[in-house]
Amino acid sequence: IESGLLKDDLGLVYEIGTLSKILAPALRIGYMIGPGGPLLDAVVQKTSDAGFSAPLINQEIASYLLDHHASEQIARVNAGYRQKAKSVRHWIDSQLGDHLVECRGGSAGFYFYLTLDGIATHENSAFFRFLARTTGRPEIDGHPPDKHPRVVYLPGEFCVHPQGDLVTIGQNQFRLSYGFEELPRIEQAIDWMRQAISYAHTSGG
C-alpha cells in the first residue's frame, strides 16, 4: 500500500510503525514520520520524559540497517511470512478442515481466525482445557511438573462485543497466531487441535 505521506499536500498525515517485524524483534524500535510541528514535538518530548526510547546503540543499529539493508530485508521477511501463512493454512485445511465452518486471515498480519463446527472454544470448553492441559486427566495433561506442551490461542469470546450479535458464534471461534513460532511447532500445535476436537466430541463439551 502506498504511503499517504506521498500525497500529503496539507501536512496532515503521520505514519506510525515498528521495526520489530521487519528488522529484528529485539530492537524494539518504533517510528513516527510526519511534518514537523507541535504534534511531532509533543510525541518526542513525551517519549523522552517517559524514558521509553530504545538504547542509543539499538537506534544506531536500526539506522544503519535501514540505510543499507532495508529493501532486501523487507523482501525476505515478507517472503518468509507468506510461506508461513501458506504452510499454516495447508495444515489447518488438512487437519481441521472437516470441522471448520470458516477460516479467515493469512493474507496480512500474523493471524488466522477460525470458526469450528459445533465445538466450543471458550475458556471452560473441553477444546480449551485439552490444549491448556487442564482436563484433570494425566494421560492428556501430563504429570506435574512435566506437563505436556500447551497450545495458546485467543478464544473468540474475547473478539466480539459481549452484548453484540456475534456472541453465540464467538463461542465457536478462535484466533491463531503464526508470526512467532517456528513452522514445525505450529504443525504440531494444529495436530494437537485436531486431537482436542476429538476430545471435545467424546467428552460432550
Model-based region annotation:
Residues 1-205:
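PLP-dependent class I/II
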